[in-house]
Amino acid sequence: MHQFLRAIGFSNITKKQLNEVINNIIDKPEKLKVTKDSEGNEFAELSCDVAPNMGITVRGIYNDDDSFDIDYYYPYFMGSEKTTDEIIDIEKHSEKESYAGVCDDPNLGVTLIFYLQNVCDYLSEKAYINREVRAKGAVLSGLSVDGCILLPMKQKKAKTLNTVDSDKKDRKQLIAEARDGDEGAMESLTMEDIDLYSSITRRIQNEDILSIVTTYFMPYGIESDQYSVLGDIIEFTEEKNIITNEKIYCIKVSCNDIIFSVCINKNDLIGEPMVGRRFKGNIWMQGSICL
């Protein structure tokens, strides 16, 4: 059973109940997309929402007699706005017909990897142009089963904010130059990191780490598309799973200057979300590429 089902309101679902849900999706999908997969099979995505912008997608192959063979399913949560404008490369997972999006966003400082939602769109576009697809941007979202709400940081003065924005812009430029092989930029980034480490080491003697670090975005665990994040809450809504009636928070966060939405079961979130507070949690990153 998929560990992130609880993020969309299926915290106590049994295997029998899940099979019923999946069979209902196959019989009466709300959304159906069909294309040819990498081996020439009639590959299909069948989806149904259980709450606004979230639900379960079943992927598999249609046979010549119109019977459907399930390959796998996964819970999804659709983002609401474009997260990055960077070029996205697509890589196929080895074990099944699923894909990952990969991009280097200078805001994050790490390679961003996410689970691709619109696989049929990607395969159709790839077949149409008869070459590899490099998408320009993606709409990202995260599913979380472990999160908490933190108080906001003390507001900085306008002059300080302007300095911070200028420093961020300079760092992005250095990262871009370093990726192009500029040794001077690499050396500058290394020195910045050493200075930052020294500063944090001094401050952490008397301060809590979460009062020093405003936001962060870093890999979590052994899966390449899972991250530990800390970001400012921009807006949030409370939704309800129409099958289980479990409540789900949809939280839009700003994290390292990128914006994405996270869904989490209300029972898995410690604290009360409010605009201006911070969300801290571990997420499974998904995304739809812009074609």
Model-derived features with residue positions:
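Eukaryotic intrinsically disordered and solvent-exposed regulatory patches
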Residues: 218, 237-239, 267
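Short nucleic-acid-contacting surface segments enriched for D/E, G, S/T with interspersed K/R
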Residues: 265-281
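N-terminal alpha-helical "arm" segments
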Residues: 1-42
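Short amphipathic beta-strand/extended segments with alternating polar/hydrophobic composition
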Residues: 112-114, 261-266
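Short, Lys/Arg- and Gly-enriched loop/turn segments at beta-strand edges
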Residues: 284-291
